[in-house]
């Protein structure tokens, strides 16, 4: 007598459940079906043959055990959706503000000692890639998943990141920190423009009013500025444009690839690129010939501190974006800009002129209005 066991199943993952978390065997996938209520069930054809019945009972028992594991995992709270404590948010926001200010102030101080932006970037990026590599070496949770050979598929990401960071650094080299926020004041308008052109995202009237206020702050700050060379303002506008391209273009890569892998590959390649460019432009040669003694020691010490701050800034920024809302993030950016301007006056001996004060205020108020308006639109749309 012959008998036939029929297993009819299709697996559909539960809501908010990653199917990869529960794939233990191919048999487990081939023997489950999800009904309209979202509960898994098994279907077997009946047979009078004792051997078939024994096989059927054995398979059923194993499947029921696997299903119990699935249901238990489904009932577990999602750690990503769990409420974040206020203490965590406070440390994330405060750390991002502190390290961002440190990076800007220390970079400007290093450039005041030795005007070698490419050499500085090369060292910082090499330091960052080394720190990420050491973290992977001693971590039991995170491991490297992408190799440097993957750079070919990340060429657009690497290009826009290098372009954006080099532009920002050269802008900082030609303008004082107290004017840095104003010189890059067109970042928000450029981002809105590129989002419309590339992503077809439209901006309503109220958020656009905040954008107009930002443009007014930029125009007011630049129009009455007589202490900054035109090249600094031009680099500020160019830096705003390249940063806007960066913010719009890299979203795809951030969601598709692990963050640490992107940081490592980008930092390693940018370090080599900036070093080669420093050699080709004779920046490295002039630095070696002209810098000696205590000047070189001071530059190296500041460079170490800025590189360490830059590494922690990457971690703090990603953490803040993860645990806070866009409104909280933009408010922290505004607070950082004000503190950064005041610290530039206190520690770098810069002068805060009237046009810079009004320009920064208009840019920050416009940015906050735009952010609050967009957040209101988001809540209305999701209601």
UniProtKB/Swiss-Prot annotation:
GO CC field: Golgi apparatus; Golgi membrane
Biased composition regions of type Basic and acidic residues, renumbered to the chain: 13-24, 46-55
Keyword Transmembrane annotated: yes
InterPro entries: Sugar_P_trans_dom, TPT_transporter
Transmembrane helix recorded as keyword: yes
UniProt GO molecular function: antiporter activity; GDP-fucose transmembrane transporter activity; phosphoenolpyruvate transmembrane transporter activity; triose-phosphate transmembrane transporter activity
Comp. bias (Polar residues): 25-44
Cellular compartments annotated: Membrane
Parts of the chain that traverse the membrane: 87-107, 112-132, 157-177, 179-199, 205-225, 228-248, 262-282, 299-319, 329-349, 352-372
Membrane topology: Multi-pass membrane protein
GO terms of biological process kind: GDP-fucose import into Golgi lumen; phosphoenolpyruvate transmembrane import into Golgi lumen
Top-level taxon of origin: Eukaryota
Region (Disordered): 1-55
Main subcellular localisation: membrane
Keywords carried by this UniProt record: Membrane, Transmembrane, Transmembrane helix, Transport
Family designation: Belongs to the TPT transporter family.
Protein name in the entry: Uncharacterized transporter C22F8.04
